[in-house]
């Protein structure tokens, strides 16, 4: 079965082998570099049916690190299109994971420590920016304190996901995935451990799901019914009082109704 073809909406996969999104931390100002062209071309030569580009920031401030790819500018489409074309030539389907790092933005690259950035990082040429999140609580002691998102910023980020999905289609990606896991922005709205807002986007589980579901709805409307839309979630927080596996099951039923 692994090597049988699979049709998902209008996309035909030659097999069911999927290369998951794996950050390369090798972009410059969010743009594709030679490393990416070599890396993804090599993956396509392996024969996988579906190949995901790494987590790609829908805004510059939504990147995990200075080395993460971005899709917030039309000028970034050209480099991304080179990747999709090379993947397609070798018979695989190109996919992209769209994300916003939220409170975990502006981190060090793994080989520089994988923690919050410091003056050591700026000395090597990286920049530090202010993260945004549902609340103004830092991820942990010593981490950058995020700015609590106002309603206007929710609208801006939602629109950024929409624009990113438009650019993804223009660049030649045939499958789109929204990143809602690992403590990044959309996951942090879902979890009661990171979201204690007192407006319509916090409190009850219905309110905490509201913003992520709004993003899904707008992206689905933008890309149409024929393009497969995936969502990556963390099954549970693994902490008392956090997001549970039962929450995930309920959420997945709702996502399916929304066209995921």
Where are the regions a protein language model picked out?
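A cross-family glycoside hydrolase active-site/sugar-binding cleft signature
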Residues: 20, 54, 95-99, 135, ...
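Active-site glycine- and acidic-residue-rich loops that bind
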Residues: 30, 158-162, 167-169, 201-214, ...
């Amino acid at each position: 079965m692994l090597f049988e073809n699979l049709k998902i909406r209008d996309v035909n996969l030659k097999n069911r082998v999927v290369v998951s999104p794996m950050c390369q931390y090798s972009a410059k100002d969010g743009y594709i570099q030679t490393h990416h062209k070599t890396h993804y071309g090599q993956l396509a030569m392996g024969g996988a049916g579906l190949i995901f580009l790494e987590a790609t920031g829908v805004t510059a401030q939504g990147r995990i690190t200075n080395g993460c790819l971005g899709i917030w500018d039309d000028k970034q489409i050209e480099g991304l299109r080179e990747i999709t074309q090379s993947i397609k030539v070798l018979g695989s389907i190109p996919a992209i994971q769209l994300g916003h790092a939220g409170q975990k933005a502006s981190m060090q690259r793994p080989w520089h420590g994988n923690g919050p950035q410091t003056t050591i990082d700026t000395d090597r040429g990286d920049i530090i920016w202010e993260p945004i999140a549902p609340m103004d609580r830092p991820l942990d002691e010593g981490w950058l304190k995020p700015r609590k998102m106002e309603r206007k910023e929710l609208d801006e980020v939602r629109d950024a996901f929409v624009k990113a999905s438009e650019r993804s289609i223009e660049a030649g990606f045939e499958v789109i995935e929204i990143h809602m896991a690992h403590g990044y922005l959309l996951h942090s709205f879902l979890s009661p451990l990171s979201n204690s807002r007192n407006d319509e986007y916090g409190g009850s589980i219905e309110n905490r799901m509201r913003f992520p579901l709004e993003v899904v709805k707008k992206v689905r409307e933008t890309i149409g019914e024929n393009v497969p839309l995936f969502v990556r979630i963390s099954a549970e927080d693994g902490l008392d009082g956090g997001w549970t596996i039962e929450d995930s099951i309920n959420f997945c039923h709702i996502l399916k109704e929304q066209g995921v």
